[in-house]
Amino acid sequence: MKAYLLLCFLGLSTLSIAQSAVGTWKTIDDEDGTEKSHVVIYEENGKLFGKVEKLINPEQTICTACKGDKKDKPIEGMQIMWGLKPDGSKEWKGGKIMDPKNGKEYKCKIELKDENTLNVRGFIGFSLLGRTQTWYRVVE
């Protein structure tokens, strides 16, 4: 009986991991299709946050366009996504995302399309006024 319960628990744990946006994601530029960075999405106090782990062939490594405490700081290690709250089993909304290229902040929502594909939408005002990038899970 204990072995059965353990197997059930492990199965549920695996299912919840597969349905989570937590992990490392390869970002793809929606304008030219090139790989730009790896972003680590992590959970803290029930919300999702994202931090740049690695830049791929960077045009810039310092966020000169950023404002506030991010101004003139390295992009690697920088938090660029914050405050996303779960909205169903595969969506998170209500957060913000910052584009290090121009330093602008946008409202953000993300949707897990499958265990290795994440749609990240940044927008102003309404979700219709924005753009979506597709990120891919880094599988090591």
What are these regions (language model features)?
Residues 20-34, 133-140:
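K/E-rich alpha-helical interaction surfaces of small helical-bundle regulatory domains
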Residues 1-5:
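Positively charged n-region of N-terminal signal peptides that target proteins for export
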Residues 29, 34-99, 105-106, 140:
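Central antiparallel beta-sheet cores of small beta-barrel/beta-sandwich binding domains
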Residues 44, 113-114:
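Structural motif
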Residues 115-117, 124-140:
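Edge beta-strand at a domain terminus
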Residues 6-13:
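Bacterial N-terminal signal peptides
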Residues 14-20:
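Sec/Tat signal peptide C-region and signal peptidase I cleavage site
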Residues 30-32, 100, 111, 125-126:
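Short polar/acidic secondary-structure junctions
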